[in-house]
Amino acid sequence: SPIHMSKLNNLVQKATNTSADEEEASAKYSGLTGTPEMKKWYADEGEDVYIISDSLRLHGKRFKNSGSDYALVCHGYTSKAKHMAGFVKKFYDRGFNVLAVDARAHGDSEGAKIGMGWPERRDIAGWIKLILSWDPDARIILHGVSMGAATVLMASGETLPENVKAVIADCGYTSEWDEFIWEAETLHIPWFPVLNAASALSKLRDGYD
């Protein structure tokens, strides 16, 4: 309905609008990692929260704000939630409650295998469920960078509650295969037959390429 679309547009604009003043103040947020002050704020203000997904104990940081707008923030490959302090603070300053999560096998989350977003998509459903346990009326934006972007995009292909209103995917990739080819070429190493062997092993061991 027009009213529903208006509310959705307002939520997305709240998350993504950049005014001239904000562009001038971009150094305040210092990219995704944040300034030293933001890192301290992240450590001091965040509340540790946990879920169980695929028998793994996963860790996140919750930043409470007023209202029912939530941002679920996902980091990239080999990173961790605290490295997203700049994004977390920016969402928080715009009035969002924020949940920044450590992906499986990253940060303080359990796990030994990194799935580049495919198994991690299931974890997003668990985090959404946790948010809804706090606030059944939550309006949720999923935000991810790199592997986090791939994670939230793949999660968006699942059946999610209507509380999820938008997805912000920053520098995701078309496929793991293309990403690893690019990495190999960047390092000037042959991707064949290494990727083919790794793909076969992944399918045999974990059930997916």
Where are these regions (language model features)?
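An N-terminal hydrophobic leader/cap segment in hydrolases
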Residues: 1-52
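A short loop-to-beta-strand scaffold at the N-terminal edge of the catalytic core in hydrolase folds
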Residues: 53-63
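Short beta-strand element of the alpha/beta-hydrolase
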Residues: 68-76
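Conserved alpha/beta-hydrolase
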Residues: 88-110
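Catalytic nucleophile-loop/oxyanion-hole region of alpha/beta-hydrolase
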Residues: 106-135, 139
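Short beta-strand immediately N-terminal to the catalytic nucleophile in serine-hydrolase-like folds
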Residues: 142-144, 170
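Gly/Ala-rich beta-loop-alpha elbow adjacent to hydrolase catalytic centers
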Residues: 144-148, 152
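Hydrolase active-site cap/lid region
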Residues: 154-209
